[in-house]
A protein has these predicted regions:
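Boundary regions of SH3-family modules and the immediately adjacent low-complexity/disordered segments
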Residues: 1-20, 25-64, 71, 77, ...
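Structural motif
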Residues: 8, 79, 201-204
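Aromatic- and glycine-rich peptidoglycan recognition patches
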Residues: 28-31, 36-56, 62-65, 215-290
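Terminal peptide-recognition signature
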Residues: 24, 154, 213
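...with weaker cross-activation on analogous glycine-rich loops/strands in unrelated enzymes
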Residues: 3, 167-236
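Glycine-rich catalytic cores of cysteine/serine-nucleophile enzymes that process amide/ester linkages
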Residues: 41, 62-63, 67-108, 138-149, ...
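Short, glycine/acidic-rich beta->alpha junctions
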Residues: 2-5, 16, 73, 150, ...
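N-terminal capping segments
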Residues: 82-185, 209, 226, 278-288
């Protein structure tokens, strides 16, 4: 279903018969994990962890070090940790590690202010573009395979930086938050017109079945999207289906691959298949300021 970042709070629901696996829930998913991958937390730990003041990682593949400069954990954009103190050039954070009895204990972790910030980061177009630039080109990984992101984990991590919580599944992200706009009954031209007229750059999600995209603005009258995509569906003259692999986070129009001779016109066009838009504008903010 989904990978879970390091130091994510979980609830253990059940152990397998051999006690090697645990069925766990997080705030956004559930599934089985090896018991060696988590540590139990007592009430005192929980009280300390729920500090109410948090830091968020803003640079992918960031190493968090202890006070001696030794490696503790690796984190990426959107990963959240309790914030202890802001120093001149570093943030001091709480990091959970397991002791010999598999109990969670707290260590100090340090990370450069270039790689982490107090959560939430102020939303504006400059900050939004910076976070997108950190993610662009990152490999595609369905469900977090090999530690990479798929389309919905990319959008989820992106918005976490700005304090906007999203569900994990692409359809839920569009239907369970913000202002939902149904595009399913419109022609491709009408869809793009609505997106250009009503979409808020970096605050609007576009959705087709199985794929979610972030609207980021327009160029030459065409909508631009930022998304992590596996590939474009193709079909040759013999009717054989395939994929033109992209396999990373990219910026495209709503018709990537339209120049391909063998693009599957029915299933391969994002614009033709977009069914909805969701505008995630917070109540106290009409549009992001530069």
């Amino acid at each position: 279903r989904s990978s879970v970042p390091v130091n994510t709070p979980i609830y253990v629901c059940h152990l397998s018969a051999d006690r090697a696996w645990a069925l766990v829930e997080t705030s956004y998913t559930y599934g089985w994990i090896p018991v060696e991958d988590f540590a139990s937390a007592d009430n005192e730990f929980v009280k300390t962890w729920e500090s109410g003041c948090y830091a968020v990682i803003i640079r992918d593949h960031t190493s968090i070090l202890d006070e001696k400069g030794q490696f503790l954990v690796r984190a990426s954009v959107g990963h959240v940790f309790p914030l202890a103190e802001r120093l001149s050039d570093h943030l001091q954070m709480l990091i959970a590690v397991a002791d010999r009895d598999r109990r969670a204990v707290i260590k100090w972790g340090f990370v450069s202010v270039d790689a982490a910030a107090e959560k939430p980061v102020r939303f504006n177009l400059v900050n939004a573009a910076k976070i997108a630039n950190e993610m662009i080109g990152e490999p595609y990984g369905w469900g977090g395979l090999y530690g990479n992101r798929d389309c919905s984990s990319m959008t989820r991590d992106f918005f976490t930086v700005f304090g906007i919580w999203l569900p994990r599944h692409s359809e839920d992200q569009v239907k369970e938050a913000g202002a939902y706009i149904d595009l399913s009954g419109l022609s491709p031209e009408q869809k793009e017109k609505v997106i250009l007229e009503k979409g808020v750059p970096y605050l609007s999600l576009l959705w087709r079945k199985g794929h979610v995209m972030l609207y980021i603005g327009s160029k030459d009258g065409r909508a631009l999207i930022f998304h992590n995509i596996w590939g474009i569906r193709t079909k040759d003259l013999a009717g054989r289906e395939g994929r033109k692999i992209i396999g990373q986070a990219v910026i495209t129009t709503l018709q990537p691959g339209r120049e391909l001779r063998d693009i599957d016109s029915a299933a391969g066009s994002l614009l033709d298949n977009i069914a909805a838009m969701n505008i995630l504008v917070r109540a106290n903010q009409e549009k992001p300021s530069p």
